Each structure stands twice: as C-alpha cells, then as structure tokens.
Regions:
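Structural cue for short, hydrophobic secondary-structure segments
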Residues: 31-34, 58
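A short loop-to-beta-strand scaffold at the N-terminal edge of the catalytic core in hydrolase folds
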Residues: 9-19
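Serine-hydrolase catalytic-loop signature spanning alpha/beta hydrolases and amidase-signature enzymes
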Residues: 36-44, 56
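Flexible "cap/lid" subdomain of the alpha/beta-hydrolase fold that forms the substrate-access gate
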Residues: 1-3, 14, 22, 28, ...
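Short, well-ordered alpha-helices that flank and scaffold nucleotide-derived cofactor binding pockets
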Residues: 44-47, 51, 116-117
C-alpha cells in the first residue's frame, strides 16, 4: 500500500492510501471510511481487491487523520454536499472519471450522496452498516433536536452519541480519558463488534426517547 498527499483539492491537502498490482487497471474502487475510522481501516480489503486487478484508493476524509485543511475550517465545510464534492474533486484531480464506490458507516452516507450528485462517475455503489434513506428533510432535523431534548428528560439523562461527539467537551474527555486513548479506542471498537456478547440486534417499536434508551450505551450514552 502506497501513501501520498494530493494537494489543493477543494481546500484540502488530501492524504490517500493506494494499491494497484496492474500497470493499467481497468477499474478503480474508492473506499470511504466511517467514524471514528481512517483509510487505514481498509488496508486488508484494499490488498485483497488489488489482487483481483482493481486500482484501490482510500482517502482520509475531511477532518480525519492526515488530511489537512489549507485554511481554518468552517462548520459549513462539513456539509454532506461539500464532503461529497471533496471526493469528486479528488478523483477529478487524479484524472479518474469513473469508479466503483464502497462506503462504510458514515462513509456510506457520503458515498450515497456522491452517487446522487455525480451519477455520471459511478459504476457501482456498495454501502455497509448505514442504510441510506434518501436526502434529509428539514422535518427530520427538527425531529432529531426533539429526540435529544427528550433523551435529556429521561432518568437518568441520556445523550445520543452523535450529539455527544459534536459537543465542545468530547474531544478533551476522550484525549484525556482515564484509561488512555489507545485503550479507549480498543474498547470502543470491541463493544461495537460482532464478538461482543451483549450485542443482540432488535427492532425499536418507535422513534422515541424511551425506545432509544434501550440501545447499547455506546449509542445512547448515560
């Protein structure tokens, strides 16, 4: 696996991982990681796919890993439309006009939007661990805000994990956690894995705070 930085792409210096076993590969696969992950997450899959003759590219997305913003970031830069543009512009700079997309977790969301916004570029789309329900509506955003308030009203209080990770204190809490960052991340990924015995999927009866409180604590935090 080779690594490189592609400079001046939609305001970013993009760090990518790349594999290719053929001089003139017929197909490119772009792999987009989720949260909290990096392009490194795809290292084994990239090698497997490259042995099948595919040219594989996995970037660290905006805000992750070794990818750096050229100027100070604005919150608006992280809109789903701009995150999709990041990848489109990256592939355009690499002179790759058509490609397969594989997205995992939040990378699935970005991949789905790329497919909607730039369908002329997409050969195929594969998404994992995050179903795509279509473009978000304002009503859905308002509903999420209501759910977060209802979670706070529960006893004990709860927080949705996305709400927590976007709060001001989250970074400091994680970086300075009692067990150390490495052990925190190892535990976090283990608790979300198939190997963890208490992970038993079930369907929620409704989109309400009381139902969501039944979810594992790495999703709905006490």
């Amino acid at each position: 696996i080779k690594t490189k930085v592609i400079k001046n792409v939609n305001g970013l210096n993009f760090f990518i991982r790349e594999t290719c076993t053929e001089k003139k590969p017929s197909n490119t696969i772009v792999l987009l990681h989720g949260f909290p992950e990096l392009s490194y997450s795809f290292r084994f899959l990239m090698i497997l796919l490259s042995k099948q003759g595919y040219h594989c590219i996995a970037p660290d997305q905006r805000g992750y890993g070794e990818t750096r913003s050229i100027k100070k970031e604005k919150t608006s830069n992280f809109s789903i439309v701009n995150l999709s543009k990041d990848i489109f512009e990256l592939l355009k700079k690499l002179k790759i006009n058509k490609y397969h997309l594989i997205g995992h977790d939040f990378g699935s969301y970005v991949s789905s939007y790329i497919t909607l916004l730039y369908p002329q570029c997409i050969i195929s789309l594969t998404i994992m661990s995050m179903p795509f329900g279509g473009p978000s509506k304002k009503a859905n955003i308002n509903k999420l805000a209501t759910i977060n308030q209802e979670l706070r009203n529960l006893k004990p209080k709860r927080k949705h994990y996305q709400y927590y990770f976007s709060s001001k204190g989250a970074e400091s809490n994680i970086m300075n956690c009692r067990q150390g960052l490495k052990n925190f991340l190892r535990s976090y990924f283990h608790f979300k894995s198939y190997d963890y015995p208490h992970n038993k999927p079930f369907k929620l009866a409704s989109f309400t705070a009381s139902e969501m409180a039944k979810m594992p604590e790495y999703y709905i935090i006490k």
